[in-house]
Every structure is written in structure tokens, then in C-alpha cells.
From Swiss-Prot:
A factor required for optimal assembly of photosystem II (PSII), acting in the early stages of PSII assembly. Also plays a role in replacement of photodamaged D1 (psbA). Assists YidC in synthesis of chlorophyll-binding proteins. InterPro entries: PSII_CF48-like_dom (IPR028203), WD40/YVTN_repeat-like_dom_sf (IPR015943), Ycf48/Hcf136 (IPR016705). Residues 1-23 form the signal peptide. The gene is ycf48. SUPFAM superfamilies: Oligoxyloglucan reducing end-specific cellobiohydrolase. It comes from Prochlorococcus marinus (strain SARG / CCMP1375 / SS120). HAMAP family: Ycf48. A lipid is attached at residue 24 (S-diacylglycerol cysteine). It is found in: Cellular thylakoid membrane. The lineage of its organism: Bacteria, Bacillati, Cyanobacteriota, Cyanophyceae, Synechococcales. This is Photosystem II assembly lipoprotein Ycf48. It comes from the Bacteria. A 7-bladed beta-propeller torus, about 55 by 55 Angstroms, with a depth of about 25 Angstroms and a central pore.
Length: 339
């Protein structure tokens, strides 16, 4: 009798789970690619890398936790440590770096802004004052002596004189930020600190617009697709794509490529239009059919890290984009393409 009750309960549980996942693209097992377009790079230390930027096709910088700054002169194949002219007792988390030709900016936490006019040979530390809402989170180089700074409180500032003065772009900060991204045209999207809603700032707006999340699950990250529309990563390893341009309330049904207990942290589109998703425990997946089917990447699968950012960086001289996947504890993958 007990065995019959247990069997009936299991059938009911399977039925309920099936209803809960209906409408989703879900799988528990997916194939592994026969080859990988990535190679792992050996770094000199195991601090967490957080951002990467290039001056030209060969010369670039990688920044991260514990004042991490590395420099490459061979397109990212090898990296060497650099020192910043900052007192040794001051420890910073270098969050963001960006270049336009020889002009570059780095922002870090707490309250750090560095500016270079000679392709990163020398960096000048700038004062932001004590009234800045939040900490620096994202920096974008706009033009000569001009940059835009966004903070962990959702404040956005712009300088046109090399960082001597900063003018607010928004009338009011959006509040605590979990993640924040900027599109080339100046549009921002930001996830609230708890992931229970997100906000957008269009390129001509002076105020953030609030939007509800697409489901009951908290939002991990939001970003921009190559066509300018949004993608969303939520808890439970859910992926959603923005259905209609400019309509931030219209989302696809959830795509759940792999149920392995780990969330996705970032997404990106490679030069061939394939979708990449990265997350915990070496999760690095690719879809070559707009998210309908997925494969594991063998290099990512063998890397003992949580992948937190995926970059495909445009080259100013028209060469193919550079690709990098940043993982915790000093793990970095470099795009070499399919053979």
C-alpha cells in the first residue's frame, strides 16, 4: 500500500513539474561541441578579472580586483602585470576600463578615476569629491577629454574637460545597482540591487524609467543584443529575449538550455551570430540557431571557474572582433575562432 502511494505521488510530482516547465525551452543534458573556438590564457595571478579594453589591434589592458592591471602587446595572447602610481596601502577593485585611440579611463572602487592620454603609459588620478552618489561602476570614453561615468547608485555624469569637472546627465539616481550596461548610442539598462525590477535610460532622457521583471524570478543581468534590443538572464538559469524594439515589457518565453543548479551571468553574440551564455561551474554554452538548441563548449566545461563576463570587442581598424571570457580566480579564455 505504501509503495502504491509513493508511486502515485511521484506521478503527480512529474505531472506538476511538466506543467511548470511547459512553454519553456528546457533540457537537462546537451551535447558537447567537437571543438572549441576558445583557448585558455595563463595569467600571472588569480585575482578576479572584471573588464578589458584595447587601444589598437595588439595593445590592450585587463583590470580587476585587488588593483589588478595587466597589459598585452600581442592582441591578448600574453599579459604582463603593470603597476599603478597609487600608495601600496590603498586597495581598489578596478571595475571598468575604456579607450578611444590613445585616450583611456579606468574607474574603481572605492571612488577612483584614472585618466591616460598616452595609450596607458601614464595614468593620472582624478578627484571626484565626496558628494558622488555611490561608487564608480562603468566608464565610457566619448571623445578627446570627454567621458561618461555611471555609478552603483545609478547616477550618470559626463566630463568634457578631461575629468576636471563632471556634469550630471540624470536628474535623479536610480538607486542601488546590481548590474549596468551602456549601448553605443548612450542608452543604459540597469538591474536593481535585489533584481526585482530594472530601469532604462534612453539616449535623450534625463530620467530613468522603471520596468517590472518578466517573471517572478529575480533578474541577474540585462544587456543589449547586436540589433539593440535587450536580453535578460534570471535566477533559475532562465534566458529571455526582448520581443519588440523599444517595448521593454515584451519578452519571449523563458529559454532554459541546461538545468545544472547554476545561474547564467552573461551573454554575448560572436562574429558569426552565435549566442554564448556563461555562468557558474564552467558553464559556457553556445547556440547556433537563435536559442533553439545549445551545446557545451569543451574548453569552458574543463575550466574550474565561474564565468562572469563575455566580451566581443570591435576593432577600430576593421579587423574581426576580439573575444574574451572572464572567469573568477584569474581564468580567462581568448577567442581564436573555429578551425
Amino acid at each position: 500500500m505504501n509503495r502504491l502511494i509513493k508511486f502515485s505521488f511521484n506521478l503527480i510530482l512529474i505531472f506538476v513539474l511538466g506543467l511548470g516547465l511547459s512553454g519553456c525551452v528546457t533540457t537537462t543534458r546537451i551535447p558537447v561541441q567537437s571543438s572549441s573556438p576558445w583557448e585558455e590564457i595563463e595569467l600571472a595571478n588569480d585575482d578576479n578579472p572584471l573588464d578589458i579594453a584595447f587601444v589598437d589591434d595588439n595593445h590592450g589592458f585587463l583590470v580587476g580586483a585587488n588593483r589588478l592591471i595587466l597589459e598585452t602587446t600581442d592582441g591578448g595572447s600574453t599579459w604582463e602585470e603593470r603597476d599603478l602610481d597609487i600608495p601600496a596601502e590603498e586597495n581598489f577593485r578596478l571595475m571598468s576600463i575604456d579607450f578611444k585611440e590613445d585616450e583611456g579611463w579606468i574607474v574603481g572602487q572605492p571612488n577612483l578615476v584614472l585618466h591616460s592620454e598616452d595609450a596607458g603609459k601614464n595614468w593620472t588620478r582624478l578627484s571626484l569629491g565626496s558628494q558622488l552618489p555611490g561608487n564608480p561602476y562603468l566608464i565610457t570614453t566619448l571623445d578627446t577629454s570627454s567621458a561618461e561615468l555611471a555609478t552603483t547608485a545609478g547616477a550618470v555624469y559626463r566630463t568634457t574637460d578631461g575629468g576636471k569637472n563632471w556634469e550630471g546627465r540624470v536628474a535623479e539616481a536610480s538607486g542601488g545597482v546590481r548590474d549596468l550596461r551602456r549601448k553605443e548610442d548612450g542608452t543604459y539598462v540597469s538591474v536593481s540591487s535585489l533584481g526585482n525590477f530594472f530601469v532604462t535610460l534612453d539616449k535623450t532622457d534625463q530620467a530613468w524609467q522603471s520596468h517590472q521583471r518578466a517573471s517572478s524570478k529575480r533578474v541577474q543581468t540585462l544587456g543589449f543584443k547586436p540589433d539593440g534590443q535587450l536580453w535578460m538572464l534570471s535566477r533559475g538559469a532562465e534566458i529571455r529575449l526582448n520581443d519588440a524594439s523599444g517595448d521593454y515589457e515584451s519578452w519571449s518565453k523563458p529559454i532554459i538550455p541546461l538545468v545544472n543548479g547554476y545561474n547564467y551571468m552573461d551573454m554575448a553574440w560572436d562574429p558569426e551570430g552565435n549566442i554564448w551564455a556563461g555562468g557558474g561551474n564552467g558553464t559556457l554554452l553556445v547556440s547556433k540557431d537563435d536559442g533553439n538548441s545549445w551545446e557545451k563548449d569543451p574548453i569552458g566545461y574543463a575550466t574550474p571557474t565561474n564565468f562572469i563576463r563575455i566580451f566581443f570587442l570591435k576593432n577600430p581598424n576593421g579587423n574581426p572582433p576580439k573575444g574574451f571570457v572572464l572567469g573568477e580566480r584569474g581564468h580567462v579564455l581568448r577567442w581564436v575562432g573555429y578551425s
